[in-house]
């Protein structure tokens, strides 16, 4: 399968970190089947056997408009209780496990916490975000009028953006 090929390649490359940028499932909280739980448990466990796995949630992983409901991913990761899997459900600044390198999470389930996400001076700060960014393009070249602009990420050395589904640069410098 594609996943087995990915696992082989990640092992061969001696991958240090796997980052999953959300939209792991499409069903939000509806239609969660035993097969889905089984496949996700297998997928997360196999990745965690290779290296630490860092995960943020996407809009399809839970109900953005009803944040009191549990998302589809948290209970699976919690039940796995694997010390090599890290889920960042709340906005904040977290260690990547490498000295001087931080995840700066802007969670789509915790927009209130965005104001507290600030880069750490002297460190490498990687913004993680799952959502529509103004000016990004879909895989059919449709330009998105997003919820945020790239200015949200201007103080960070890097930004890894989920939800866009297409590799692209969103600034003139192509950084």
PLM regions: where:
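Core catalytic region of metal-dependent phosphoesterases/phosphodiesterases
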Residues: 1-94
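A structural signal for the main folded, soluble domain(s) of proteins
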Residues: 4-12, 111-113, 166-174
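Generic signature of intrinsically disordered, low-complexity segments enriched in small/polar residues
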Residues: 6-9, 22, 97, 112, ...
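Active-site neighborhood of phospho(di)ester-bond hydrolases with catalytic His/Asp-centered motifs
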Residues: 17-23, 52-59, 86-91, 106, ...
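Short, conserved loop/helix-junction motifs that constitute active-site signature segments
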Residues: 45-49, 118-121, 150-155, 172
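Conserved catalytic scaffold of divalent metal-dependent phosphoesterases
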Residues: 61-151
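Conserved beta-sheet core of the metallophosphoesterase superfamily
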Residues: 134, 139-175
